[in-house]
From Swiss-Prot:
Organism whose genome encodes this protein: Escherichia coli O6:H1 (strain CFT073 / ATCC 700928 / UPEC)
Location of the protein in the cell: Cell outer membrane
Its membrane topology: Multi-pass membrane protein
Gene3D superfamilies: Porin, LamB type
Listed name of the protein: Putative outer membrane porin BglH
Length: 538
């Protein structure tokens, strides 16, 4: 054995002078290779034991005397009952540095949370999303949603909307970063068991790529901290969450923009995007594509006082029409395109005990003003369900909104969404050109907080709207909703914490329906529904 070791040592010492590393590996016998591996393993185990002993000395609590208790039969009770294995607080990570630390250890400790974050940052990939899904039944057959944008969402939505975002960092060096982002959104039907996209008579199942763009940091010398993006992407959306529509929304086929550009006390978001529309003729049977471009400019996060910020926004939409498109509008009965704009301001106040409230003021003209006049959903689109039509004559509309939530004591929370709007000489999709309208919608949601994971409450919604057409005929639409609910939650906030599972019972009634003629099943003007819904984002 001694002779074999001497020969082996001589071979190992002389090999670098005569052979490459590959040649050495090929010349060693299986026995020699195993001996080298065993030696390396012993050294590693010794180093690991040394580190564990050091950590044990640091964190092992002093021993205490325990009296041995006995059970009812007189036997000694187990002083160390078996328990489920706990998740370790830390993991061992081998240091990259060649020189060991002062203790001589080549390992260091890292918490699982930090280790998980490190791995995610190293990979540079994230998967984010949102969806809702649930079951419901009603007193008159299939449950129906009505006026979600005015009466509120709880117990009044039966869709399966989803958003799925994939983000991959592709470069992050020398103060410059590049990310690729793709987002898909759509709806999965909640009525039939089959969910094939595009193969459903009700049109429930659909999906689109709403975003596909590249965003960067550090490439613009004048705004190194800003997010500069190019591709299919729009300006950030701002939502009235309880009503499920947006106060700020600029959809895009493709564009270029800058977000979070630090200028003065606030930040600038600016986007130039393309958003073509289908321009219809007066029969609403024929259409032509019109190229439109939108500029969306916002100056946000302007500090006012403690926990209060201001945003000022503006949006302008213009068409780039061809000669043939203009000729169709002049001679073939197609609706004329009219430039449209929207501008306004919003103030956000955060509260010391948690919660917030956001107040906004917006004014718009032409087709955006027409969408201010919609009671069901009032996002500032330039079209109605993707179709551009109507005799727009420069009329304007104004909208005032309030939304937020506030804690009252330790066990109560109240969320609200209140909207007042009116317009003059607008095109209404219900009452035509030269219409005036006025509406108010209010939803409040008080709840009792049992603990971090349970709330019981009620959502109360009411709205009323009156339109007056060009002949001064008046049309009224109004209704109310009452929803009792209990929710399983992970935090106490109503508007900013998900996942959430809610159980509800809803009574909803249409008081007047002169704008849309809506009825529930069996031509009823009311509906009682019960159900359960899950909503999650991550």
């Amino acid at each position: 054995m001694f002779r074999r070791n001497i020969i082996t040592s001589a071979i190992l010492l002389m090999a670098p002078l005569a052979f490459s590393a590959q040649s050495l590996a090929e010349s060693l016998t299986v026995e020699q290779r195993l001996e080298l591996l065993e030696k390396a393993l012993r050294e590693t185990q010794s180093e690991l034991k040394k580190y564990k002993d050091e950590e044990k000395k640091k964190y092992t609590p002093a021993t205490v005397n325990r009296s041995v208790s006995t059970n009812d039969q007189g036997y000694a009770a187990n002083p160390f009952p078996t328990s489920r294995a706990a998740k370790p607080d830390a993991v061992l990570v081998k240091n990259e540095e060649k020189n060991a630390s002062e203790t001589g250890s080549i390992y260091s400790s890292m918490t699982l949370k930090d280790f998980s974050k490190f791995v995610k940052d190293e990979i540079g990939f994230s998967y984010n999303g949102y969806y809702r899904s649930g079951w419901g039944t009603a007193s008159h057959g299939s449950p129906k949603s009505w006026a979600i944008g005015s009466l509120g969402r709880f117990g009044n939505e039966y869709s399966g909307w989803f958003d799925l975002q994939l983000k991959q960092r592709v470069y992050n060096e020398n103060g410059k970063r590049v990310d690729a982002i793709v987002m898909m959104d759509g709806n999965v039907g909640q009525q039939y068991s089959t969910g094939w996209f595009g193969d459903n008579a009700g049109g429930e199942n659909f999906m689109q790529f709403s975003d596909m763009y590249v965003t960067t940091k550090g490439f613009l010398p004048f705004a190194p901290e800003a997010d500069f993006w190019v591709g299919k992407h729009g300006a950030p959306k701002i939502e009235i969450q309880m009503l499920d529509w947006k106060t700020q929304r600029t959809d895009a086929a493709a564009g270029v923009g800058l977000e979070n550009w630090k200028v003065g006390p606030g930040k600038i978001d600016i986007a130039l995007v393309r958003e073509d529309v289908d321009d219809y003729d007066r029969s609403l049977q024929n259409k032509q594509q019109i190229n439109t471009n939108t500029i969306d400019l916002r100056y946000k996060d302007i500090p006012l006082w403690d926990k209060a910020t201001l945003m000022v926004s503006g949006r302008y939409v213009s068409a780039n029409e061809s000669a043939s498109e203009k000729d169709n509008q002049d001679n073939n009965g197609y609706y004329d395109w009219k430039e449209t704009w929207m501008f306004g301001t919003s103030l956000t106040q955060k509260f010391d005990k948690g919660g917030f409230n956001e107040f906004s003021f917006l004014v718009a003209n032409n087709s955006i003003a027409s969408n201010f006049g919609r009671y069901a959903g009032a996002s500032p689109f330039t079209t109605f369900n993707g179709r551009y039509y109507g005799d727009h004559t420069g009329g304007t509309a104004v909208r005032l909104t309030s939304q937020g939530e506030a804690y009252i004591g330790d066990h109560f929370i109240v969320a609200n969404a209140i909207v007042y709007s009116f317009g003059n000489d607008i095109y209404s999709y219900e009452t035509g050109a030269h219409s005036d309208f006025e509406s108010i919608r209010a939803v409040v949601r008080p709840a009792y907080i049992w603990d971090q994971y349970n709330q019981t409450g009620v959502e109360l919604g009411y709205f009323t709207q009156q339109n007056k057409d060009a002949n001064s005929n008046k049309y009224n639409e109004s209704g109310y909703k009452t929803t009792l609910f209990h929710t399983f939650k992970v935090n106490t906030s109503m508007l900013t914490s998900r996942p959430e599972i809610r159980f509800y019972a809803t009574y909803i009634k249409a008081l007047e329906n002169e704008l849309d003629g809506f009825t529930f099943e069996d031509n009823k003007d009311d509906q009682f529904a019960v159900g359960a819904q899950a909503e999650i984002w991550w």
